[in-house]
Amino acid sequence: MRKVLCGLQAVIFCILLWTGCSVKENRRECPCRLFLDFSETDAEDVPYADLHVLSGEGFHLVEHVDSVAFGEELVLHVPRRGARVNAYCGAEGYVSEDGSLEIPYGSECPRVYMHFSYVETDCEAAFEKVRVRKNYCLITVHVEETDFPYVLDVRGEICGYGVDGSPANGAFLFAMRPDGNGVCSVSVPRQVDNSLRLDVDDGTDVLKTFALGEYVTASGYDWSAESLGDITIGLDYSLSHVTLKIEGWEKELHFDVEI
């Protein structure tokens, strides 16, 4: 009788052990509940967010979130192998299938607000704050001569943002023609060096080049700031003097340029 009981106990133990392993394996296959908190995104600047959640093996979830829902947590079910959370506002037509943002050569940067983060999701529930911030700098150029006959070309070496939010290397060009008041503007992406420049082009040749990136760096402007500010540039009639003013700053910087 004792041998029968011992045998029965062994069978029951094996069944429990097999069941436990099975439950554990099933839980691993279950998705992670990802809670996204938009409460630190300013609805006045960001009326909506186009959410791209990417994980391995081709998982790409796209969700449109209106600002009225920013006060509530958004719950998504994602694979348990980590997820990249990208959110955009103002980037329609520029976001690729892999979640990166590409600026076509000849176009300016879209007036985009963005969030990028990577979340570990090897768990039953994960939490992430989504902070959508301004990721473009609007450079407005004032030319002293209102009847300015030339085109102003802004060139750089950043052409968008990678899937991880880092500035993407590539040629950038946007051509501007000042209006009747001598004003024009361009939106540029976040920079990583001083390569940004401003060319004065008469249609056949570059007459003058301004080291725009160096002027901006000398001003103390922070390209790594969470939200990028805007810049105003002034060019005198002879194109030999540059003024630079950063949005929200009282001081104005002056640079003399050799002809």
Stretch-by-stretch model annotation:
Residues 1-24:
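Sec-dependent bacterial lipoprotein signal peptides
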Residues 20-259:
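Extracytoplasmic cysteine-anchoring/structural motifs
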